[in-house]
C-alpha cells in the first residue's frame, strides 16, 4: 500500500481531454433535468413490489458485503427497461482466461458511482446536501490524473450535477469524459419514477469500440448494479456518513486500480483476485 503518489502515465504523456466514441455526450450543467427525461407521477406496482431480484453468478459473492439504504427492496425493472441482465457466454469465456500483466501501466477507464461510493446524502428533503467519504477529493484528483474517468449515478440528473459540483473543481469537471444520471439507464417512465433496481450495463460505454471488458472497471457500492459484467465491478462498502466507518477505503481502491492499470484484461484479473479491504490498513503517513 503506497498512499497517493503522482500517477505513472505511459510514455510520460499528460492528460488531454478526448472525444471518445460512446463517451462524448457530457451531462448538461444546469440543474434542470433534460427535456427527454421521463416525467409523471410516482406510481408503484404491487406485483413488482412483491417480486424478488434473482441472485447473480456465484462468483459475485466474493466482493465485500454492502449495507442496505432502505428496508424496502428495489423492484425488478420492467421488460421495457431491459429487465434483469445476465453475463453473456462470450463475456464469461473471456473472463475465464488467465490474467496477464503488462510491462507498463496504461490509462484504463474508471466508471465512478457517486452516492454511497464517494458521497452520502443524509436527507432526501435536502438533496443538495452531501457528506464526502474520507479522501474522496484526493482520490478523484488522482483518478483524473492517472486514468480516464466517467461518472454514472442512478440519481436524477439535477442531483448528479450538484454532487459533481461539490466533489470536483470546474477544471476537473472538464476532465471527466461523461456524466450520466438516471436518464441514462433506458428506463421506462414508470421505472424512472419508481424505486427500481437499475443495472449499469457497461456495454453502454463500450458502444464506440475503444472500451471493453479488458480495460474498464466500474467502482460502485452495489454489486448488483454490475450484474451484467461482474468481473468488471469493484465493489466497496456503502458509505453512510458515519464516523465509525472504515476511513481508509478509497486509498485501498487507489492501490487496486493501480494494479488494474497493469492488466492486459481487467475482467480476468478481477475474477481471479477480486478487491478485498484490509480492515487494519493504515496510510503510510499515519504509521510514521
List where the protein language model places each region:
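Non-catalytic pre-domain segments flanking phosphatase-related domains
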Residues: 1-112, 125-128
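Conserved phosphate-coordination/catalytic loops
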Residues: 89, 130-134, 192-199
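Eukaryotic intrinsically disordered and solvent-exposed regulatory patches
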Residues: 94-99, 103-106, 133-139, 150, ...
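Core residues of folded domains in eukaryotic genome-function proteins
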Residues: 106-117, 139, 145-148, 175, ...
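Substrate-recognition element of Asp-dependent hydrolases with the DxDx(T/V) motif
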Residues: 136, 140-165
